[in-house]
Design a protein with these regions (language model features):
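Non-catalytic C-terminal accessory modules of carbohydrate-active enzymes
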Residues: 32, 45-46, 129-272
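Conserved structured core elements
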Residues: 15-25, 38, 42-45, 49, ...
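Surface-exposed helix-capping loop/turn segments at secondary-structure junctions
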Residues: 30-40, 57-65
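Long, well-ordered core segments of solenoidal/helical folds
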Residues: 45-64, 85-105, 127-146
Length: 272
């Protein structure tokens, strides 16, 4: 989100609303499955398929592998929400990277809507390095740029200190996007496998240039920790698993899942 008259920075409303409708259909189908309502599961999945087919017919350009005007948000949302035919996913993601790294110089290239899915989608598709650059950058546009220019909360606009007309809000937390989720779920790798964190997944992402991660989460089951440091070609981890819970640990480079009970555990893995 910025104050700009550049058309490639904007995404048409229709190409935003439908992906979120499809995302909500997925969520409702999961709710229905938990309740044992198979007819409702089938209904919501049908609604998603119907909307997805119409959306792709309306907005997807086969010649360029772009949605709508090719903005990062226009391509990112259908990719994040599983709406793109599998054979086109790689080309659409390549367009996201091309726009981000070339036109935007490796900077954040979405507004308040797209930023909700940006960090996780990049990491899921093998570009955690780019997500880390976004998280640590302090040049415009970035979260670090806000901090460097005196912000103590998240601005409404990436260019909030220079926008004309000026921004309305200097406390616009939604522009933080999925940054904090990404830090906990991807850098620390802490996720719930079962409700209430009675069963925990620890699946950290190791990124070149990031040598130390310390992550703790106060879950309803107790404190969970996932701490990692690099030592040469080894990653050394210390995890804390709450009482009466279990954890599965998936580490890059490991061929199998490690399973742990309650307590503090030290782990070693070689970084390939």
């Amino acid at each position: 989100m910025c104050s700009s008259d550049l058309p490639y920075r904007y995404t048409e409303g229709g190409s935003i609303s439908t992906p979120f409708y499809c995302h909500l259909c997925d969520i409702m189908a999961k709710f229905a499955e938990l309740l044992g309502l198979q007819d409702d599961v089938d209904h919501f999945l049908f609604c998603k398929r119907f909307a997805t087919n119409a959306y792709n017919a309306m907005f997807f350009d086969v010649a360029t592998a772009n949605y709508e005007n090719g903005s990062v948000t226009a391509n990112l949302l259908p990719l994040a929400f599983g709406m793109i035919p599998e054979e086109w996913e790689g080309d659409v993601f390549a367009n996201i990277l091309n726009m981000t790294e070339n036109r935007f110089g490796g900077h954040v290239s979405t507004g308040v809507v797209g930023i909700q899915q940006l960090m996780r989608t990049l990491t899921d598709r093998g570009r955690a390095d780019l997500a880390l650059k976004f998280a640590t950058d302090d040049t415009y546009p970035s979260w670090g740029y806000m901090v460097r220019n005196g912000a103590t909360t998240i601005w409404e606009l990436w260019n909030g200190n220079t926008a004309d007309p000026s921004m309305n809000s200097g406390n616009h937390v939604m522009l933080l996007g999925d940054l904090i989720l990404w830090e906990y779920e991807y850098l620390g790798g802490i996720r719930a496998l079962e409700p209430g964190y009675s069963k925990i997944l620890i699946k950290p992402t190791f990124i070149d240039g990031l040598d130390t991660v310390r992550c703790a989460y106060e879950s309803v089951s107790g404190r969970i920790e996932s701490n990692w440091r690099r030592d040469g070609d080894m990653m050394i981890g210390e995890i804390l698993i709450p009482a009466n819970t279990t954890a599965e640990v998936w580490l890059p480079g490991d061929d199998e899942v490690r399973k742990f009970g309650s307590g503090r555990h030290t782990l070693f893995t070689r970084v390939r």
